[in-house]
């Protein structure tokens, strides 16, 4: 089995769980290369699945990221699925969960163009 662990190049060194996850998958007999989501040389069809890990630059590149996810879901099993991705890119979903009584990490929301400080 071959599963892509999908990241952003800038996030590679910041995702502290990425290498341990990859090592655990290798120990379980799964080939799990770490792949940048925007690497246009990647053939996503060669993977049994693509697991989104640390694609953290999607915020600045949302239309491009969603187009990528749409394309990849037609080539392999995308985890999370596109509909989940589209619902989760706007973090206001956390406030909706909290309003329903679900515990969340304390959160503040900065709107586009707002000073987040």
List each model region and its residues.
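A short, Lys/Arg-enriched amphipathic alpha-helix followed by its capping loop at the start of a domain
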Residues: 17-30
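Active-site nucleotide/adenylate-binding loops and adjacent lid/helix of ATP-dependent enzymes
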Residues: 1-7, 13, 69-75, 79-117
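Residue-level signal for short, function-critical loop segments
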Residues: 9-10, 56
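N-terminal glycine-rich "phosphate-gripper" loop used for MgATP/nucleotide binding
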Residues: 30-73, 79-88
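Accessory recognition modules or surfaces
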Residues: 11-12, 47
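Generic recognition of short, well-ordered alpha-helical segments
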Residues: 16-20, 45, 63-64, 92
